[in-house]
Amino acid sequence: MEKQSIRGKRRARKFALQALYQWLMSGTDLHEIEAQFRTINNMDKVDGEYFCRLLYGIPTHVEALEASLLPYLDREINALNPIELTVLRIGSFELFHCPEIPYKVILDESVSLTKEFGSQEGYRYVNGVLNNLAKQVRSVEVSLDNE
């Protein structure tokens, strides 16, 4: 993958985290949130298609994504820090719906987002949950990587 494509996806995740956090906290319509982000932010270097894939895909699959996370959580979904919950939703969506992205990249990007926006030690929790989910969802990829 080209560096520009990698950076564009990274920026898309960052904006998607902020947009999905806004959706979680306010319930604002996703189309309105997208319009706000495109108006307020310089999205020239953002992979806009990937941003929309996350922005619209995660709410569409939110119940299934959260159900997939439950076995690996030590608390109820509603007790999670909203940023960490949003990062977990993004990471789980990517694990299930973006097979073109290696699971290690998904984990690394999720950890980076949590370090930047989440609580001080939240990245460890996010990494542990998504690593366990990856072992189930991407079992072949994980086992090949561990050989």
Swiss-Prot record:
Q: Which UniProt keywords apply?
A: RNA-binding, Transcription, Transcription antitermination, Transcription regulation
What are the protein's GO molecular function terms?
RNA binding
Its biological function?
Involved in transcription antitermination. Required for transcription of ribosomal RNA (rRNA) genes. Binds specifically to the boxA antiterminator sequence of the ribosomal RNA (rrn) operons.
- Any coiled-coil ranges, and where? none
Supply the PANTHER family for this chain. ANTITERMINATION NUSB DOMAIN-CONTAINING PROTEIN, N UTILIZATION SUBSTANCE PROTEIN B-RELATED
* GO CC terms: cytosol
Is Transcription there in the keyword field? Answer: yes
Name of this protein: Transcription antitermination protein NusB
Q: What GO biological process, any one, is recorded here?
A: DNA-templated transcription termination
Highest taxon above the source species: Bacteria
Question: Organism, per UniProt?
Answer: Legionella pneumophila (strain Corby)
Family matches, as SUPFAM superfamilies: NusB-like
